[in-house]
């Protein structure tokens, strides 16, 4: 076997093994995140510490599937004092009717609807937030995307870390729920078995370089310190950048122990492709190093490649005589075999964890 071929072979082995190590880490790191016991304990500590009044900002655009059901979870919070501010940019937005239903269903809940067409920059969601922020009455703010569903103790849990003056932003990891047929299922797998595990791995290595639109909790003082929502009006990844700007001012980003749910509704391959490629472009723009590591974090192709090579070149493979004659290292085949077994275990664990939330 030539030196070049041997080097290429060992490079493939190294990549397959690295993907397996990553998959095992992703499957088994932070096992209690989002667990019932951890959430219950976090809620208990939040109650002991005392709840603060909260203004929840929910920018809306269109009547998404399950919009009423998702927004209703914010109306059912076990929190003594909070305000819900919903915002749309058009008087014809069908989300208005959903907000009116919420107001009728929870007449004693502090629910306000802001209809304001002013545009402040290229990011229309941030323009909506700028228009809504003036109606927020409390000094603790929570921003959450429209397709998010939460548990009853959510507000207390995500705002509790803000009592520490060193904390700037609290964010939440999320679990995907498919709404519809095959393609929404694929989109949910992308979140549950690739994106969420990558965040867990990054967090376990000490990284706090994230901020998710599923939840961004901060104080009004922190928001003003970074320039308000106006500082994000022309930014693509506004959620990520809000947390990063706070970190640039020496304030920590905290990942809350509670998981929220997000809906995946794209009905066709084309719409799902647009969503995922837009997401990947966003990652590339804000985290080039993380984007460069994507080939390893997509572990299934490496697992298939490793298994195929073992099947072909292993002791009972069709190309076993050729590999022996060429001097293919037995250690490389053994490493590939071990990597394949470990990768299969990791993929099964990732799927179970993504499906059940353990």
Role assignments for model-derived ranges:
Residues 234, 240-262:
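Catalytic donor-sugar/metal-binding loop of nucleotide-sugar-dependent glycosyltransferases
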Residues 52-55, 83, 241:
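Cell-envelope/extracellular polymer assembly enzymes that use nucleotide-activated donors
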Residues 80, 88-102, 118-120, 148:
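A conserved acidic beta->alpha catalytic loop
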Residues 1-48, 185-189, 197-201:
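N-terminal membrane-anchoring/stem segments of glycan-assembly enzymes
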Residues 144-161:
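Acidic donor-binding/catalytic loop of UDP-sugar-dependent glycosyltransferases
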Residues 101-138, 157-226, 230, 273-274, ...:
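Long helical/loop segments within the catalytic core of UDP-sugar-dependent glycosyltransferases
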Residues 72-81:
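Short, acidic, metal-binding catalytic loop of nucleotide-sugar glycosyltransferases
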Residues 28-30, 36, 297-358:
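Membrane-embedded multi-pass helical conduit in multi-pass membrane proteins
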């Amino acid at each position: 076997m030539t030196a070049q071929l041997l080097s290429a072979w060992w490079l493939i082995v190294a990549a397959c093994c690295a993907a397996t190590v990553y998959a095992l880490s992703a499957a088994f790191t932070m096992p209690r995140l989002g667990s019932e016991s951890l959430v219950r304990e976090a809620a208990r500590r939040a109650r002991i510490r005392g709840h603060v009044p909260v203004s929840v900002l929910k920018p809306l655009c269109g009547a998404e599937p399950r919009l009423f059901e998702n927004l209703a979870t914010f109306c059912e919070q076990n929190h003594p004092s909070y305000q819900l501010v919903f915002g749309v940019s058009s008087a014809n937005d069908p989300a208005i009717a959903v907000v009116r239903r919420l107001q009728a269903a929870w007449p004693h809940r502090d629910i306000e609807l802001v209809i304001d067409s002013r545009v402040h920059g290229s990011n229309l969601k941030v323009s909506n937030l700028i228009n809504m922020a003036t109606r927020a009455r409390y000094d603790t703010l929570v921003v959450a995307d429209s397709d998010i569903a939460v548990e009853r103790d959510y507000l207390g849990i995500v705002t509790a870390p803000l009592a520490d003056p060193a904390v700037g932003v609290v964010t939440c990891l999320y679990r995907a729920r498919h709404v519809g047929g095959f393609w929404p299922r694929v989109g949910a797998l992308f979140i549950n078995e690739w994106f969420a595990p990558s965040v867990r791995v990054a967090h376990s290595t000490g990284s706090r370089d994230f901020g998710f639109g599923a939840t961004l909790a901060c104080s009004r003082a922190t928001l003003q310190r970074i320039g308000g929502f106006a500082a994000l009006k022309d930014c693509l990844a506004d959620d990520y950048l809000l947390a990063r700007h706070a970190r640039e001012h020496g304030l920590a980003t905290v990942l809350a122990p509670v998981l929220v749910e997000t809906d995946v509704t794209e009905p066709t391959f084309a719409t799902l492709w647009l969503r995922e490629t837009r997401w990947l472009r966003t990652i590339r723009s804000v985290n080039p190093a993380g984007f460069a590591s994507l080939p390893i974090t997509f572990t299934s192709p490496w697992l298939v490649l490793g298994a195929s090579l073992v099947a072909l070149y292993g002791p009972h493979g069709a190309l076993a005589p050729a590999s022996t004659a060429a001097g293919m290292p037995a250690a490389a085949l053994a490493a590939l075999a071990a990597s394949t077994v470990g990768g299969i275990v990791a993929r099964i664990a990732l799927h179970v964890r993504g499906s059940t939330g353990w």
